[in-house]
């Protein structure tokens, strides 16, 4: 659900350039099959970060690889380690990476991220989280020791279509436990302590922070 004024949303969509064949196909498949992928603007932000940093990325939540492709296309020496629990979606993603010519920059690790993160070596320069919303804070806590000093954290869906601002008990599109998890994480990222960050009204709301 858009969190911006519809006129602004329409204007931003009109600015989008033509997508590569692989990316356009992924968008069509996601819409057809109901696969959750990031908004294009979110992918573009990740792409710009990867272009600037050329990081080693840890991504929690591959789905069919749409956000992964945005990042991998911009890497030279960097790479993406992406975690996905759904084997069928992981296989779909591999096919897209091969066709887009970025398979050598991406490693897909299958399984529950709460279990697979422990086996990763790191260190990572960028952590991107877009998976089960109620588990966001657990993913971050598990991955944090594997991040470099001053690593960047990016988290998707933190405004949840604006539902995080709805009064408790109001009818919303998101479950209350997901909303509660997002509210706590937003406070942690913005309020200081372990992270210096903010929540941006981009896509469905993106948290951007760095370790302090």
Predicted feature locations:
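A short alpha-helical cap/connector motif
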Residues: 1-126, 133-154, 158-212
């Amino acid at each position: 659900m858009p969190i911006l004024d519809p006129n602004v949303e329409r204007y931003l969509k009109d600015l989008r350039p033509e997508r590569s064949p692989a990316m356009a196909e992924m968008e069509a498949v996601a819409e057809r099959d109901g696969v959750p992928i990031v908004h294009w603007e979110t992918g573009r932000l990740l792409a710009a970060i990867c272009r600037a940093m050329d990081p080693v990325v840890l991504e929690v939540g591959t789905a069919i690889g749409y956000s992964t492709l945005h990042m991998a296309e911009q890497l030279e020496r960097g790479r993406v380690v992406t975690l996905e629990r759904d084997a069928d979606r992981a296989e779909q993603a591999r096919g897209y990476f091969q066709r887009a010519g970025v398979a050598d920059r991406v490693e897909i690790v299958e399984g529950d991220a709460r279990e697979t993160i422990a086996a990763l070596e790191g260190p990572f320069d960028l952590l991107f989280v877009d998976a089960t919303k109620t588990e966001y804070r657990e993913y971050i806590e598990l991955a944090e020791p594997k991040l470099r000093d001053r690593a960047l954290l990016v988290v998707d869906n933190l405004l949840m279509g604006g539902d995080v601002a709805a009064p408790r008990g109001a009818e919303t599109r998101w479950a209350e436990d997901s909303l509660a998890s997002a509210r706590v994480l937003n406070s942690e990222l913005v309020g200081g302590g372990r992270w210096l960050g903010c929540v941006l009204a981009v896509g469905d709301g993106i948290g951007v922070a760095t370790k302090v």
